[in-house]
Amino acid sequence: MSLLTEVETPIKNEWGCRCNDSSDPLVVAASIIGILHLILWILDRLFFKCIYRFFEHGLKRGPSTEGVPESMREEYRKEQQSAVDADDSHFVSIELE
């Protein structure tokens, strides 16, 4: 019996389940999806720093420079640094006393 589809109702002095043990494919699929969703949510909350740090650094790696002459690599680095320097002006520095 699936915990996700169970309906409990008071019967006399006991708690009983009004649903029958369904082997309906839709109920089975919904149960599996629900359990997987719960597992993924728990893992996300436990390891969110590791997961998002990996994606953040993975996206910032930039294009491969294999086979590119050193002069072009240096030019690319300067362009990237100037873009970063230009973006620094958008941040506000707040100092607390």
Swiss-Prot record:
In this chain, composition skew of type Basic and acidic residues spans 71-80
For the site labelled Essential for channel activity, possibly by being protonated during channel activation, and by forming the channel gate and the selective filter, the residues are 37
Question: Subunit structure, briefly?
Answer: Homotetramer; composed of two disulfide-linked dimers held together by non-covalent interactions. May interact with matrix protein 1.
* Gene designation: M
Picking any one GO molecular function of the record gives: monoatomic ion channel activity
What's any GO biological process attached to this entry? protein complex oligomerization
What are the entry keywords?
A: Disulfide bond, Glycoprotein, Host cell membrane, Host membrane, Host-virus interaction, Hydrogen ion transport, Inhibition of host autophagy by virus, Ion channel, Ion transport, Lipoprotein, Membrane, Palmitate, Phosphoprotein, Signal-anchor, Transmembrane, Transmembrane helix, Transport, Viral ion channel, Virion
Known glycosylation sites: 20
| Phosphoserine modified-residue sites | 64, 82, 93
List locations, semicolon-separated: Virion membrane; Host apical cell membrane
The UniProt site entry described as Seems to be involved in pH gating is assigned to: 41
Q: How is its activity regulated?
A: The M2 protein from most influenza A strains is inhibited by amantadine and rimantadine, resulting in viral uncoating incapacity. Emergence of amantadine-resistant variants is usually rapid.
Tell me the lineage of the source organism: Viruses, Riboviria, Orthornavirae, Negarnaviricota, Polyploviricotina
In this entry, the parts of the chain located on the Virion surface side of the membrane are 1-22
Bilayer topology: Single-pass type III membrane protein
Gene source species: Influenza A virus (strain A/Memphis/1/1971 H3N2)
Q: What name has this protein been given in UniProt?
A: Matrix protein 2
| Family as reported in the entry's similarity comment | Belongs to the influenza viruses matrix protein M2 family.
What HAMAP family does the annotation carry?
Answer: INFV_M2
